[in-house]
C-alpha cells in the first residue's frame, strides 16, 4: 500500500508503523518508533473505530481496559500525549480526532463513568458512542490546555462498510 501511494503521489517519504491500538504497550512502542525517526509531526489524525455488533459482553485488554474504550479513546489520547512534543515543533502542529455522526442520535448523552468498561450493562453501540463522546470531550480539554497545537474534532457521516467482513453476523 505504501509503495502504491509513493507512486501515485511521487512522495518517497511514505511509511507505516504497525500498532495494536487496544494494547497500550504497542501504542507506546509505535510512538517511540516515530519519535526516533522524525524531528517533528505536522498532523496526527486519530481515526480509530472499534465497533463490532457481534460482541455481546465486554472484552478486556491486557491493560484491563474495555477493548473498544482502549482502541477508541485511550490509544488516541496516549498517542497525542506521547507525540505532543513533536507536534509542538511543527509550525502547524494539529491533532484531528474523528468522532461520529451517530452522536446526533444521542443529543443528551452523558458519559457514564461508572460503566466505561460495560460492567453494569454492555451494548456495543452505546459503548461506541460513549467512546466517541469521551474522545470529543478530551478534544475540548486538549484544545483548552494545549497551547501551540490546533485540536479539532470532526464527525464523519455514515461510511459504506463491506458487510462481508462481518460474516459471523449472518
Where does each model-flagged region fall?
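Terminal hydrophobic/aromatic helix or amphipathic segment near a protein terminus
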Residues: 168-170
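Rossmann-fold NAD(P)H-dependent dehydrogenase/reductase core
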Residues: 1-165
Amino acid at each position: 500500500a505504501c509503495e502504491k501511494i509513493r507512486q501515485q503521489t511521487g512522495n518517497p517519504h511514505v511509511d507505516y508503523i504497525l500498532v495494536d491500538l487496544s494494547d497500550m504497550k504497542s501504542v507506546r512502542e509505535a510512538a517511540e518508533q516515530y519519535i526516533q525517526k522524525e524531528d517533528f509531526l505536522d498532523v496526527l489524525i486519530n481515526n480509530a473505530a472499534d465497533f463490532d455488533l457481534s460482541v455481546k459482553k465486554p472484552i478486556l485488554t491486557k491493560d484491563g481496559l474495555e477493548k473498544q474504550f482502549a482502541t477508541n479513546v485511550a490509544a488516541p489520547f496516549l498517542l497525542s500525549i506521547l507525540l505532543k512534543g513533536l507536534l509542538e515543533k511543527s509550525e502547524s502542529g494539529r491533532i484531528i480526532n474523528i468522532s461520529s455522526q451517530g452522536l446526533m442520535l444521542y443529543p443528551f448523552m452523558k458519559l457514564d463513568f461508572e460503566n466505561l468498561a460495560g460492567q453494569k450493562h454492555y451494548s456495543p453501540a452505546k459503548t461506541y458512542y460513549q467512546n466517541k463522546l469521551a474522545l470529543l470531550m478530551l478534544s475540548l480539554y486538549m484544545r483548552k490546555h494545549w497551547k501551540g497545537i490546533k485540536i479539532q474534532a470532526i464527525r464523519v457521516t455514515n461510511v459504506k462498510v463491506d458487510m462481508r467482513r462481518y460474516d459471523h453476523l449472518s
